[in-house]
Curated annotation (Swiss-Prot):
<dbReference type="Pfam" id="PF11357">
    <property type="entry name" value="Spy1"/>
</dbReference>
<comment type="similarity">
    <text>Belongs to the Speedy/Ringo family.</text>
</comment>
<feature type="compositionally biased region" description="Acidic residues">
    <location>
        <begin position="66"/>
        <end position="80"/>
    </location>
</feature>
<dbReference type="InterPro" id="IPR020984">
    <property type="entry name" value="Speedy"/>
</dbReference>
<feature type="region of interest" description="Disordered">
    <location>
        <begin position="1"/>
        <end position="80"/>
    </location>
</feature>
<protein>
    <recommendedName>
        <fullName>Speedy protein E13</fullName>
    </recommendedName>
</protein>
<dbReference type="GO" id="GO:0019901">
    <property type="term" value="F:protein kinase binding"/>
</dbReference>
Length: 265
């Protein structure tokens, strides 16, 4: 009887935690592990015993912080208006780089210089002391027209020089009388025999004498040639001042560029 009471007393005494065998749950895992994973008691008031978890939310917070760090850089970036200015500057640099990539090839300068040796053209330039029909800008337009017409350089002849010069005067000059002299120099009329008569006078004199009829036919033929030359340039007769200066800059020491009306006394 005493032995039985002793065993009962021993069974009610608390055993140390180390000697307790973990009880199995219905799932087959220790109850202690399940409790430890699910319930964690606070070790001290106001202290969170759980370690910080780097979850997806933490990554997003970090990305937000990184983006917030980049925001000052975005504020320092140039505004769209400044970007447009930069693009405009790049455009100007491209122009400077291209130098408008002048379509006037060296062969057209060579054709122009070759025609300057023509005796009739020399006589016209020597006669035009006041530079009323052949100043430096009008002569530069001749080179531009040669380029736009697109003929091979060796095909340009005296008639093309006079057609281009006449068309340049049509574009830039308002006085018709000096321009008529270009036509008469083309047909090798001397200055003393140049009748500064209007087209109406030629029409009235058409049937009066053979010379008048010849002049009328020459004027009609010249105008026909001028129209074809104008069409060969695709009707682009206007030349900008910038392009004229670029043409002169190709050979700035050329003697024809000294024919400046501003230098006349």
């Amino acid at each position: 009887m005493g032995q039985i009471l002793g065993k009962i007393m021993m069974s009610h005494q608390p055993q140390p935690q180390e000697e307790r065998s973990p009880q199995r749950s219905t799932s087959g895992y220790p109850l202690q592990e399940v409790v430890d994973d699910e319930v964690l008691g606070p070790s001290a008031p106001g202290v969170d015993p759980s370690p910080p978890r780097r979850s997806l939310g933490w990554k997003r917070k970090r990305e937000c912080l990184d983006e917030s760090d980049d925001e000052p850089e975005k504020e320092l970036a140039p505004e769209p208006e400044e970007t447009w200015v930069a693009e405009t500057l790049c455009g100007l640099k491209m122009k400077a780089k291209r130098r408008r990539v002048s379509l006037v090839l060296p062969e057209y300068y060579e054709a122009f210089n070759r025609l300057l040796e023509d005796p009739v053209i020399k006589r016209l330039l020597a006669w035009d002391k006041d530079l009323r029909v052949s100043d430096k800008y009008l002569l530069a337009m001749v080179i531009a027209y040669f380029s736009r017409a697109g003929l091979p350089s060796w095909q340009y002849q005296r008639i093309h020089f006079f057609l281009a010069l006449y068309l340049a005067n049509d574009m830039e000059e308002d006085d018709e009388a000096p321009k008529q002299n270009i036509f008469y120099f083309l047909y090798e009329e001397t200055r003393s025999h140049i009748p500064l008569l209007s087209e109406l006078w030629f029409q009235l004199c058409r049937y009066m004498n053979p010379r008048a009829r010849k002049n009328c036919s020459q004027i009609a033929l010249f105008r026909k040639y001028r129209f074809h030359f104008f069409c060969s340039m695709r009707c682009r007769a206007w030349v900008s001042l910038e392009e004229l200066e670029e043409i002169q800059a190709y050979d700035p020491e050329h003697w024809v560029w000294a024919r400046d009306r501003a230098h006349l006394s």
